[in-house]
Regions:
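Membrane-interface extramembranous regions
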Residues: 2-140
């Protein structure tokens, strides 16, 4: 995905469209952290302090990461940031799974949690692609 520096305008356009498709949902979910924080507070693991603060912080990070992916000038750094961010927030998803915590009133089945884990993995791989690091890993 890092081929945006090449002169190929079609591949550059595709990269920009993929970046929009990846970044916009993160921005939207990040905004939702501020519009309805309680549904996110409910999934913060009980062992973490200051759940409302963490919800606002992760919302801000999702907005920043999503925007960073969208803009070519910040895409490499944002891709690396998103890898770390997605790894850092997965414990909330795991907490939901192991404690049967509903999100916004919905409890996921084991299969639902497995799908969510797989999607998290795909989001990390995509972030590695946007950063250019996936191509480096594949070359080695």
């Amino acid at each position: 995905m890092h081929c945006a520096k090449s002169g190929d305008s079609l591949s550059t356009t595709i990269i920009h469209l993929l970046a929009l498709a990846y970044g916009v949902p993160f921005v939207m979910v990040g905004i939702e952290h501020f519009r309805d924080p309680q549904k996110f507070v409910d999934i913060v693991p009980s062992y973490l302090p200051f759940p409302l603060f963490l919800v606002y912080l992760t919302g801000l990070m999702e907005i920043a990461g999503g925007l960073g992916i969208i803009y070519p000038e910040t895409r490499i750094m944002a891709g690396r940031f998103m890898v770390l961010f997605l790894l850092a927030v997965y414990p909330a998803n795991f907490y939901m799974w192991t404690n049967d915590v509903p999100f916004n009133g919905t409890r996921l089945t084991t299969n639902g949690h497995l799908v969510r884990l797989f999607v998290q993995f795909l989001l990390i791989v995509a972030a590695l692609g946007f950063s250019g690091d996936l191509q480096k890993i594949r070359r080695n």
